[in-house]
């Protein structure tokens, strides 16, 4: 939040090393909003005091009220608060800097191997015919390529990319494999 003495991830990590578990990090327990701080803990050798919230709205409210010091917030939800000086961004977990906040360094630029993004995909039930999958894939590919749509989403801080069915399946599996160790670590992975 804007009242923290940290201006970047290096400041944050130094403070966390000096006084372990003194810095509150808000997230929805068992979700990627908590996982990002667990990844940072592992990458930097620090520990935060984790505080659970039901979702982005509650986390944002807690950040703005100075009830927590850290929160993972997507750019679309946070950009107006960052630009108004009500929230302070410490780093971007995207692989590259974001056009909307071009001066904000990525976590990698700050020395932390931390790439994290909440991504959305469209899926169909198992057994859906190839013709139906291809039909929807074609529609989605067209929408993702539409300049007006991409521009409108970009202004909201939402990055649009398109992956076909096979590429998305591979990407989904790689993402699952990346998050599985963290899910096991916090006890949210249950084997059937």
Regions found by a protein language model. Give the residues of each.
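Conserved functional loop/turn residues at catalytic and ligand-binding sites
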Residues: 8, 52, 66-67, 74, ...
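C-terminal lobe and pocket-closing loops
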Residues: 78-147, 174-177, 191
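Hinge/capping helix and adjacent helix->loop/strand transition within the periplasmic-binding protein
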Residues: 1-58, 105, 117-152
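Short beta-strand and adjacent tight-turn residues that come in two discontinuous sequence segments
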Residues: 53, 72-74, 92, 163
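Mature extracytoplasmic/periplasmic domains
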Residues: 134, 145, 149-170
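Short helices/loops that flank or line small-molecule/ion binding pockets
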Residues: 39-43, 57-68, 76-84, 172
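Extracellular/periplasmic bilobal clamshell ligand-binding domains
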Residues: 164-192
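Alpha-to-beta junction loops
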Residues: 19-23, 46, 64-73, 86-89, ...
